[in-house]
Amino acid sequence: VTSITLDLVNPTAGQYSSFVDKIRNNVKDPNLKYGGTDIAVIGPPSKEKFLRINFQSSRGTVSLGLKRDNLYVVAYLAMDNTNVNRAYYFRSEITSAELTALFPEATTANQKALEYTEDYQSIEKNAQITQGDKSRKELGLGIDLLLTSMEAVNKKARVVKNEARFLLIAIQMTAEAARFRYIQNLVIKNFPNKFNSENKVIQFEVNWKKISTAIYGDAKNGVFNKDYDFGFGKVRQVKDLQMGLLMYLGKPK
């Protein structure tokens, strides 16, 4: 299993950027190009199913497991308050045997299936966000926030609310930043500070499949055949979307 590590002890914007690029480069197929663009495209499913992301702080490491064929989150690994490694996983996304290969530090006895599902709505419900529209948007983004949310699950007894908040922030700072340079650039622009998220970020996240499909099936030389609106105004030039990574949709048309 490939591991990609982000050092949160003294991170720089450059380190974060190259961390996101590494995720993108690990899952892309260099030979795939959609819509006459040079945007990276995820490769077809392969034998290596998962990617391991490590967040390192001065207090230890918390790891995230992502599916290589779509960057969906499958599991995370953290030490509890007695310094025992525990792996928590989404049952529909990964088996116990696969989890052992991904996070060998946790014994089978210390694997636990999460009581909720891997979609944003389910994680948000467990994050108990009370302000605004009660979605992940209210939590914000940023390196400092990633560190504080990680420390809330690092060497602590499990608290579902803290776990869900960590997952919401970590998914966006890894998978979503790899998919959308727009999000990666916001993190860098505000580095390392926490910043308020915005509707455009959420619109990107919920439209990844739609955007990928439009570029795959309805763009030539980087231009859409018609105007598209993905929730933040009309777009005709693919480059205006600042995409980082497209969903695998088969051989180019």
UniProtKB/Swiss-Prot annotation:
Q: Which reaction does it catalyse?
A: Endohydrolysis of the N-glycosidic bond at one specific adenosine on the 28S rRNA
The GO terms this record gives for MF are: rRNA N-glycosylase activity; toxin activity
Enzyme type, top EC level? hydrolase
Active site, per annotation:
176
Q: Name one Pfam family in it.
A: RIP
InterPro entries attached here?
Answer: Ribosome-inact_prot_sf, Ribosome_inactivat_1/2, Ribosome_inactivat_prot, Ribosome_inactivat_prot_CS, Ribosome_inactivat_prot_sub1, Ribosome_inactivat_prot_sub2
Q: Which SUPFAM superfamilies match?
A: Ribosome inactivating proteins (RIP) (SSF56371)
Tell whether Hydrolase is among the UniProt keywords: yes
Top-level taxonomic group: Eukaryota
What does the record give as EC number?
3.2.2.22
Cited PROSITE patterns: SHIGA_RICIN (PS00275)
Record keywords, A-Z? Hydrolase, Plant defense, Protein synthesis inhibitor, Toxin
Keyword presence, Hydrolase: yes
Bilayer-crossing regions? none
Provide one Gene Ontology biological process annotation: negative regulation of translation
Tell me the Gene3D superfamilies matching this sequence: Ricin (A subunit), domain 1 (3.40.420.10), Ricin (A Subunit), domain 2 (4.10.470.10)
Report the family membership: Belongs to the ribosome-inactivating protein family. Type 1 RIP subfamily.
**What does this gene product do?**
Ribosome-inactivating protein of type 1, inhibits protein synthesis in animal cells.
Supply the name of the protein. Answer: Ribosome-inactivating protein saporin-7
* Organism field: Saponaria officinalis (Common soapwort)
Q: Which gene encodes it?
A: SAP7
